[in-house]
Amino acid sequence: MSKAPDTTSKIAFTNNNTSFDEAGVNFIVNPYDEWYALVRALELKEAQGGNVTVLSVGGADYEQIIRKALAIGADDAVRIDAPESDALSVSTHIANYAKDKGFDLILCGKETINYNGSVVPGMVAELLDMPLVALAAKLDVANGVATCEREVTGGMEVLEVNLPAVISAAKGMAEQRIPNMRGIMAARTKALEVISVENAAASTSVSNYEMPPAKSACKFVDPANAAELITLLHQEAKVI
């Protein structure tokens, strides 16, 4: 599970636009991890039994992210104390932890809403030599087989994969759950496993951040005023 800035937060950069300024930024659990991957894992546990372990790669500031997952219903939580900005490093840490745990299913959000990389699930699957189903909007598990549905151009694709497998969750796999007070109170005192790793530095670095250009103003033209529309398209938009 990963964190992401709340979409209402003001984004700024420091150190000559090489660092993201986290001052005053409210972080949330990445929705694809929380609403879809985590909740569907809990639904499967409730229907079939089992245990749900949440895993995050990041610093101590990830504790609130992990504890929310516990409040929603996860059984165990692990934080790997390492930088989370490099996708390959994150994937390697996840795979190194999971390789001898005997997990039947690894569920990831399809992407984070701040980076939109969509690469960690595939890297984890490759490192663990497991099959991958990406962008699954529906997931059912029975008799050691996961049945997934995902959107394709013009319809839905149905895939079956033998477990263990890695599946990245897209919108539609589950619905958001709000943690209740009992879950919140229990999560506050539940032990977290923190794993320190050697050579945890990211293998890439950010050379520069840039804000997207400001959007141009939108002009509305009365449908009856074709002459004005032609003038605007010619003189301002310069498309005719």
Task: Label each residue range with its predicted role.
Residues 1-240:
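N-terminal glycine-rich FAD/FM-binding segment characteristic of electron-transfer flavoproteins
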